[in-house]
Amino acid sequence: MKKINLAVVGATGMVGRTFLKVLEERQLPIENFYVMASSRSAGSKLTFNGKEYTVEELTEHSFDKPIDIALFSAGGGTSEKFAPIAAAHGCIVIDNSSQWRMDPEVPLVVPEVNPEDIAWHKNIIANPNCSTIQAIVALKPLDDKYKIKRVVYSTYQAVSGAGVAGWKDLENGLKGEAPKKFPHPIANNCLPHIDSFLDNGYTKEEMKMVNETRKILHNDNMRVTATTVRVPVFDCHSESINIEFEKPFEMDELLETLKNAPGVVLQNNSEANEYPLAVDAAGHDEVFIGRVRRDESVESGVNIWVVADNIRKGAATNAVQIAEEIVKNMQ
């Protein structure tokens, strides 16, 4: 692979630091490496591949130097302002915020699912929402084989999805302290409220899952609904997914399809109490699937339980995988 110049924007945040860890693990070939953040974090030090780097302040001139790929995880406002600047300088931006996801000019990519969409980028590629990424890895092989008619998501999302502040709310809440990030205590509680409420009664998080599922699977007519819930778990999102197919299926064949799907680990042995758990998925890049059973209330439906590390596969690793695909195709 060609060596590239790479920047991480939002390098001091939870996902930003995980970018560095995943880049080290996967050994993307890097010539020059830059870490950038807001003025608040500028001047701090980060270590990457055994070398210390000084965090630069992100400005309009940050991309005057040659940078091939920039991994952004600094929020929608930062991406809205700086991603077009980077793109105009010839840098390919892989953005982890929601800013560009539903832009028809911007590919929304999960490499195990739709890597071909990378080809039509205009120097900005969107990383999907964390809860969508793990779901789509599970849905894609089933959609290819049985044609999905309808999806019902129920999520159990870790506090790390709300960043360091969400993590601290749970940590401090277990000591009896009042929440600062969430509207109610998260310790010993479940909050059916992720992101803000919309006029249709759904939250933004729920509609992200609906709209992103359709875009990634290239099916605007797919019936999708979601209820997203924040739970008192530090890391890893869990999801109950009910899927209805257009075609009939045999359970043995469906299980084999999941077992052979890219990025999937099937843990489906109820007799041995084997099923995906957040504590086991933490630190891994795979999507874990279990509790697979026929939905007996419809003609052709299945229930599955899906767990993944939301900061790794749900954010940092997915973005780095996109970068790997880009580098493979560089001359």
Question: What are these regions, as identified by a protein language model?
Answer:
Residues 1-186, 222-223, 287-288, 292-298, ...:
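N-terminal Rossmann-like NAD(P) cofactor-binding subdomain of oxidoreductases
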Residues 70, 159-331:
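Charged docking surfaces used in two-component/phosphorelay signaling
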